[in-house]
Regions:
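Flexible, acidic/Gly-rich N-terminal and inter-domain linker regions that tether
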Residues: 1-23, 28, 74
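C-terminal scaffold of the Radical SAM
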Residues: 4-11, 33-57, 61-348
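C-terminal functional modules
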Residues: 348-351, 356
């Protein structure tokens, strides 16, 4: 192992992981738990216990951004907001720190938005996936195009303008024409920030899920997932997005991330800092951390995490020092230093895990 190297930035960001899903997806990355109301409530309580167990040294570090990731929006909004308030009291958030939440369109409504805005959530990462009903069906999505439109109306009603729209390329059955319609729809509503991500086959996530939970990831309702398009087709779709969004006033600020030109805040805070190599404090089952040159991962086992979340030694898996090779693998150079081929390679390699 090479000697530990300094991080690319001295910033600290916090990733609070909610490994819950409404149902098993056809495609990954997988979230292994569905869970009833009681299980979800117990999980949030465990997050608060892990938060309370942090060392004073960690709690004193300035935090630039907090992300509530995964299935955060399908949890009780009241419980999530209580957790956010605990985070604010426990950690040293800098003035104006970003607090973002990953959101399923079906969960965007008056009660959830009332809670999210009241506790200080400042950014929404909306899992739009596609603006085409046939593609949403192929993905096994929980929402339709109409329900996505309804979510946008609610966000507008609550003046939540800091929204990132995540859409997927490489969907089975996706064509250049359907992909163009999705991109034009987002440009037509003046989306400030659009993230395009490669669709990941659940099978690629199968080994990790099985190792962590003892259960293999399977296609939704036992139906085999359709094969993904070829790399050549996927690259053509990526390049198509670059052209269409570029012609409509968007700048690619990182591989797959497009912001309205001249609107720097639209790029968010968490994502750029993650790509720059910021230290990451991960909280929750399966959360991954990088602190002071060490990498470690929390166990994904729900029962273990809920019972032992305050015991670092009981829940942490595979702590090791980060070497230069692993740092370079996850840090994205400035986009102007990347060729077109390098941008696509970076996005395809780790794009599905990129923060927005």
């Amino acid at each position: 192992m090479d000697a530990c190297i300094a991080p690319a930035t001295d910033k600290l960001i916090v990733d609070v992981v909610f490994p819950f899903t409404l149902s098993t997806p056809k495609y990954g990355p997988s979230r292994p738990f569905t869970g009833n109301h009681a299980a979800k409530a117990a999980y949030v309580d465990a997050l608060e216990a892990e938060l309370a167990s942090l060392d004073d040294e960690v709690c004193m570090r300035p935090v630039s951004a907090v992300r509530l990731s995964g299935g955060a929006s399908i949890m009780s909004a009241d419980k999530v907001c209580h957790l956010v308030r605990r985070i604010k009291k426990t950690l040293n958030l800098v003035p104006g720190a970003e607090i973002s939440i990953d959101v399923e369109p079906l969960t965007v409504c008056t009660p959830s938005l009332t809670d999210w805005t009241s506790c200080g959530i400042t950014r929404v990462n909306l899992a739009a996936l596609s603006c085409d009903d046939a593609e949403l069906t192929a993905l096994g999505a929980h929402h339709s195009r109409e329900q996505l439109q309804n979510a946008l109306l609610f966000l507008e009603k609550f003046h939540m303008a800091n929204v990132n729209f995540e859409v997927l390329y490489g969907v089975p059955g996706q064509t250049a024409a359907s992909w163009k319609r999705t991109l034009l729809t987002l440009a037509g509503i003046d989306a400030l920030h659009v993230s395009i991500r490669p669709l990941v086959d659940a099978a690629s996530d199968k080994a990790w899920t099985a190792a962590q939970t003892g259960k293999a990831n399977t296609a939704q309702e036992g139906v085999p997932a359709a094969p993904l398009p070829s790399p050549e087709t996927r690259r053509a779709l990526y390049e198509q997005a670059q052209r269409i969004l570029g012609e409509r006033g968007y700048t690619e600020i990182a591989p797959g991330d497009f912001a309205k030109s001249g609107l720097a805040p639209a790029s968010g805070v968490f994502g750029p800092l993650m790509r720059a190599g910021a230290d990451v404090l991960g909280l929750g089952a399966g959360a991954r951390s990088r602190l002071d040159g060490f990498l470690y991962e929390n166990a994904c086992d729900y029962d273990l995490y809920v019972a032992k979340s305050a015991d670092f030694e009981a829940i942490v898996r595979n702590p090791l020092r980060e070497d230069e090779q692993s740092l370079h693998a996850r840090v994205c150079p400035p986009i102007e230093n990347l060729t077109a081929a390098q941008r696509f390679e970076f996005l395809e390699t780790i794009g599905a895990t990129l923060a927005r």
